[in-house]
Amino acid sequence: MGIEESQICNPSDREFLSVDILNIVTSSLSLMGSALTIISYIWKKVRRHRIQKQQIQQQQQQIEKGGLLSSSITIGNGSSHYGGIGGGGGSGNGTGIGAIGGPHGTYKQPTSKLPLLIFMLSIADFFTSFFIIISQSYLINNSKSYSTPYSPDLKIHFSPCIILRAIIQFFFLSTFFWTTCISYYLFHQLSSPGEEKYLLAIFNVVSWGIPFAISMVITMTNSIVVNSDGWCEVAKPMELSLWFLPLFLCLLVCSIYYFRLRRLFRSKFEYRLQINDRLKQLDSTISRRLTLYIVVFVICWLPDVIQHFISFFSKCTFFPLLILQNILTPSQGFWNFWIYSYTNKIARFTPSNDENKRLLQ
């Protein structure tokens, strides 16, 4: 008996059911992790806005007090005495107000776009997990209705299975592209720091627009089909070009940027060895945390890539790999939340210089 005919390549219905349940469990963890990341980001934005508002009010009060103090000196001492002392007082007030209004009003501290990019990635992770839970629960509870078309006479086939698969496809692809955008952004900020006016707009077009176009194509061309197990999957020709190829390219680009980012970080901060070993340790820690987003993406999707490679040469559904795939693939949102939490801890306890603010805060 060949390996393709063995039990390891032909899981039973009960084993497929266990995979579905495992998928729901890991997706639930990812859903909670993504939700916590989203809530944390929004809360930080609201808190920062309140602090900035309070600072502006305090600055205005100090400016008003400074103006009243100048007026009282002028009225109390007369114009001749004000000319001798008021010049010094005016200079003092001017310096005080300048220290308040100048730096805070004109100098804009460098801030990282990384939290916003992680927020967008978390939105994609959240909805991916949400619709996976709905899809798998529907399949377990009513497999017949799950794959039954709404209207067989329509040229374009629609069923709960097809619609949910298209939505999951969209959000999964979005996580691919957002992670790739994050890897590019991190490398760009280290290699040639500076604001790019349309960078976020480009990221949004790439990470939402391309997945939407791909999902529409596979839906409108009836490329989402129901297999013998009741699952919906993309037909082989489309799966290769519109699922596996984007995934493989994103993994490749992220891997390239990961190694380039590590090499660039080491070369850029190598001089700190001669200044302070603690600073080098902090920079090394920051580097590891930042690149973890890329590493998690690669690890979570590597089993899926291997499974696709196997399917090109064999009909074997390698069950151990299928289990690993259903543990890692839906759990990306959970691991991203874990990295986000650690990154924020490092940002909180790291000396607040321009380099760290541009990369983390």
Curated annotation (Swiss-Prot):
Family annotation (InterPro entries): GPCR_2-like_7TM (IPR017981), GPCR_cAMP (IPR000848), GPCR_Rhodpsn_7TM (IPR017452)
Subcellular location: Membrane
SUPFAM superfamilies: Family A G protein-coupled receptor-like (SSF81321)
Assigned keywords, A-Z: G-protein coupled receptor, Membrane, Receptor, Transducer, Transmembrane, Transmembrane helix
Keyword Transmembrane helix: yes
PROSITE patterns: G_PROTEIN_RECEP_F2_4 (PS50261)
Residue spans crossing the bilayer: 19-39, 114-134, 167-187, 198-218, 239-259, 293-313, 319-339
Major localization class: membrane
GO biological process: adenylate cyclase-activating G protein-coupled receptor signaling pathway
This protein's name: Cyclic AMP receptor-like protein C
Source organism of the structure: Dictyostelium discoideum
